[in-house]
Regions:
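Conserved small/polar residues in nucleotide/adenosyl-binding loops
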Residues: 178-183
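Alpha-to-beta junction loops
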Residues: 26-29, 72-81, 94-96
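Hinge/capping helix and adjacent helix->loop/strand transition within the periplasmic-binding protein
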Residues: 1-66, 115, 128-161
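Mature extracytoplasmic/periplasmic domains
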Residues: 158-177
């Protein structure tokens, strides 16, 4: 599922270039929240800070719900958040979207430019959800569960619901996430 860089509706920077300029003009003063230290949203922020060469104040929360409340309330200014959480808030005008974090624009947010389009080629961040089981789970059971989940994810009504909130189904094996090289590999080392 893609992530979006979003801000409170009343924040001064409404585009990614304006936000970078604001962060450079006020180093360490612009407040970014995340769903928690080490979360996918926090990782997206740290990668973006490194790529854009900016310094911001990071405030980790205990999940997305309290972060979204404080973003809408003006206690934090910006954050990276999963499209499934951010989309209804964008549609209601409670937050604004500055950028999305996949290489190509998501179908559910076609008017929001990517971070890569706005001067940071190769930038990509996403959130994934998966099913896991015990280490010694029989291979036949793993295969059966994977097939059943893929079959459900292929259903038209499920695809429609996922599309409504900006979720993008990857399906398949979670092992690919761990064995495929990532453009992020080594970026923060």
């Amino acid at each position: 599922t893609p992530t979006l860089l979003i801000g409170g509706a009343d924040q001064p920077a409404k585009t990614l270039p304006d936000l970078v300029a604001l962060c450079r003009a006020q180093p360490g003063k612009i407040i970014f929240g995340s769903a928690g230290s080490g979360s996918a949203q926090h990782l997206a922020l740290e990668i973006f800070k490194a790529r854009a060469n900016i310094d911001v104040l990071h405030v980790p929360y205990k999940g997305s719900a309290p972060l979204m409340n404080d973003l809408m309330g003006g206690h934090v200014q910006y954050c990276f958040e999963g499209m499934t959480t951010a989309t209804p808030l964008i549609q209601s005008g409670k937050v604004i979207a500055l950028a999305q974090t996949l290489q190509q624009r998501s179908k559910s947010q076609p008017n929001v430019p990517t971070v890569a389009e706005q001067g940071y080629p190769g930038f990509e961040a996403s959130i994934w959800f998966g099913m896991v089981g015990p280490a010694k789970m029989p291979a036949a059971m793993v295969q059966r569960m994977n097939q059943d989940i893929d079959r459900v994810l292929a259903m038209a009504d499920v695809q429609e619901k996922l599309a409504q909130v900006g979720a993008e189904d990857g399906g398949g094996s979670v092992c690919l996430l761990y064995t495929s090289p990532s453009p992020r590999d080594g970026l923060l080392s």
